From Swiss-Prot:
Binds 1 [2Fe-2S] cluster per subunit. This cluster acts as a Lewis acid cofactor. The keyword Membrane does not apply. It comes from Erwinia tasmaniensis (strain DSM 17950 / CFBP 7177 / CIP 109463 / NCPPB 4357 / Et1/99). The modification N6-carboxylysine is found at K124. This is Dihydroxy-acid dehydratase. [2Fe-2S] cluster binds at C122, C195. PANTHER family: D-XYLONATE DEHYDRATASE, D-XYLONATE DEHYDRATASE YAGF-RELATED.
């Protein structure tokens, strides 16, 4: 029988000092026999997806204590990728994932907590907490802040839905008036919550459901809706039961590595492909799998991407649907239900509810359930009122979207495409693979060839695009923006956004060893591995080289003879210590970022730290 970790600090005469300090936090004699459960919050006023979380940790803590546990809350950092976008702040986004994972480990291990509730939401916070959970392998439940309502405004006598990306595109479009741009900006992000499309934050919060670590509705139920309160209350109650299952009943099925097994990771990736999720999820799932010592790598993603159809199309891939529409159509379990009926799920995996996926679908898939309370929950909708308050409205859709032929979520035979929403491409330009969000690629661009326009930084590429130096047919190559070369693997949302603003969104391709925002669409290929700073072929590309992209055949090829590439590599090697560094780029890189770069691996490994360099 495992011993409560917290007993290390609460039992024995030699722990009198620790108990004295615990008493100073409000603990009593009765508390010293109870499990100590960390409430890992991420409240900050910097991020709309986290601005409403201040009191939600207390809500969870009160339920933990009412259920027989001791709750202790702490906070992690949280970077807003949208605000950090397009300047030096974006260098810090991906490295913050590692800091979050480490800070959770530090706090939980330093104080010997027995279990955790992770209150996450936005881009790097959920992945960082997920990595920590699998690293620590103690009972955990995720409950995120929830999605933002979609923006809505009236332009040209038509009501349109909006999100952050629309504000960025129209703000840079010279053909849009100042008045219209301002109206779109003011309407795009109306409430608290993670940005309203299938961007990175919402993708990851959906994936925690598929991994079995969060409750039904976690990924899609709006931040503003009163129903979301119940997820937080249930998390507080359920984590105590989960904790006691492990420590008092020796039930290892309560541990995250046994819930988020390889089969669960494959289910999660299958979901991601089916819903056309953010390409960043590839990085984060690979990183989390390594933390949990789970045998899941990019070859698994490639295999799944060839099998799974595209069943759910959401902004930024279409303006028609946002997360509120996904929820109305049954949320994550609506998609998983269609995948299960298509024979693409392992429905034996179990979750924090103690149910198998098969049992969970029977109760929570709107196409199967007879539970009126479940149907009511999935009718939770937007109120259209600007607010930063959680649980501030209780609007309901009159009906569910159960149209699996024409609706937001489709059955396999009516899929948006039989090819999934993400693909791994291989070739001499990316020998270890690169990622494209096929859900956002125009059908006419699935096969594309063009001359390279090479830039050593995102900033140079943006200047060239806005300056008219990039023309239809070009393949924009942005290199030395990988985990090591950036450092920090910046998101390239501004270059892709500005291509659209200049009318080139369907006429150009973009390839980078950096990454893309979940808000990116178009022929945008990221995560080229090995990255330029690690000697990848992308470092050898020259202006005018022809690059051939074939998504159906999963190929990406630099049309340069092998002997010419060998000569270029010798020339690059001859630069000595400057080899595989950007030519003429001036960028201030802090000590913290240099330290990150020293251990960073390429994207095909999840951009995690290279443990071999530490002897581990």
């Amino acid at each position: 029988m495992p011993k409560y970790r917290s007993a290390t600090t609460t039992h024995g005469r030699n722990m009198a000092g620790a108990r004295a300090l615990w008493r100073a936090t409000g603990m009593t004699d009765d508390d010293f026999g109870k499990p100590i459960i960390a409430v890992v919050n991420s409240f900050t006023q910097f991020v709309p997806g986290h601005v409403h979380l201040r009191d939600l940790g207390k809500l969870v803590a009160e339920e933990i204590e009412a259920s027989g546990g001791v709750a202790k809350e702490f906070n992690t950092i949280a970077v807003d990728d949208g605000i950090a976008m397009g300047h030096g702040g974006m260098l810090y986004s991906l490295p913050s994932r590692e800091l979050i994972a480490d800070s959770v480990e530090y706090m939980v291990n330093a104080h010997c907590a027995d279990a955790m509730v992770c209150i996450s939401n936005c881009d790097k916070i959920t992945p960082g907490m997920l990595m920590a959970s699998l690293r620590l392998n103690i009972p955990v439940i995720f409950v995120s802040g929830g999605p933002m309502e979609a923006g809505k405004t009236k332009l040209s006598d038509k009501i349109i839905k909006l999100d952050l990306v629309d504000a960025m595109i129209q703000g840079a479009n010279p053909n849009v008036s100042d008045a219209d741009s301002d109206q779109i900006e003011r309407s795009a992000c109306p409430t608290c919550g993670s940005c309203s499309g299938m961007f990175t934050a919402n993708s990851m919060n959906c994936l925690t459901e598929a991994l079995g670590l969060s409750q039904p509705g976690n990924g899609s139920l709006l931040a503003t809706h009163a129903d979301r309160r119940e997820l937080f209350l249930n998390a507080g109650r359920r984590i105590v039961a989960l904790t006691k299952r492990y420590y008092e009943q020796d039930d290892e099925s309560a541990l995250p590595r046994n819930i988020a097994s390889k089969a669960a990771f494959e289910n999660a990736m299958t979901l991601d492909i089916a819903m056309g999720g953010s390409t960043n999820t590839v990085l984060h799932l690979l990183a989390a799998a390594q933390e949990g010592e789970i045998d899941f790598d990019i070859s698994d993603i490639d295999r799944l991407s060839r099998l799974v159809p595209h069943l759910c199309k959401v902004a930024p891939s279409t303006p028609k649907y946002h997360m509120e529409d996904v929820h109305r159509a049954g949320g994550v379990l609506g998609i998983l239900g269609e995948l299960d009926r298509a024979g693409l799920m392992d429905n034996s995996v179990r979750n924090i509810l103690g149910l198998s996926l098969r049992e969970t679908l029977d109760r929570y898939d709107i196409m199967l359930t007879q539970d009126d309370a479940v149907k009511k929950m999935f009718r939770a909708g937007p109120a259209g009122i600007r607010t930063t308050q959680a649980f501030s409205q209780d609007t309901r859709w009159e009906t569910l979207d159960d149209d699996r032929q024409h609706g937001c979520i489709r059955a396999r035979e009516f899929a948006f495409s039989q090819d999934g929403g993400l693909a791994v491409l291989y070739g001499n330009l990316a020998e270890n693979g690169c990622i494209v969000k096929t859900a956002g690629v125009d059908e006419g661009s699935l096969v594309f060839s063009g001359p390279a326009k090479v830039y050593e930084s995102q900033d140079d590429a943006v200047a060239a695009i806005l300056g008219g130096k990039v023309v239809a047919g070009d393949v924009v190559v942005i290199r030395y923006e990988g985990p090591k070369g950036g450092p920090g693997m910046q998101e390239m949302l501004y270059p892709t956004t500005y291509l659209k603003s200049m009318g080139l969104g369907k006429a150009c391709a973009l390839i980078t060893d950096g990454r893309f925002s979940g808000g990116t669409s178009g022929l945008s290929i990221g995560h080229a591995s090995p990255e330029a700073a690690s000697g990848g072929t992308i470092a050898l590309v020259k202006d005018g080289d022809i690059i051939n992209i074939d998504i159906p055949q999963r190929g990406i090829q630099l049309d340069v003879a092998e002997n010419e590439l060998a000569a270029r590599r010798l020339e690059e090697d001859a630069r000595g210590e400057a080899a595989y560094t950007p030519h003429g780029r001036e960028r201030q890189v802090s000590f913290a970022l240099r330290a990150y770069a020293t251990l960073a691996t390429s994207a095909d490994k999840g951009a995690v730290r290279d443990k071999s360099k530490l002897g581990g």
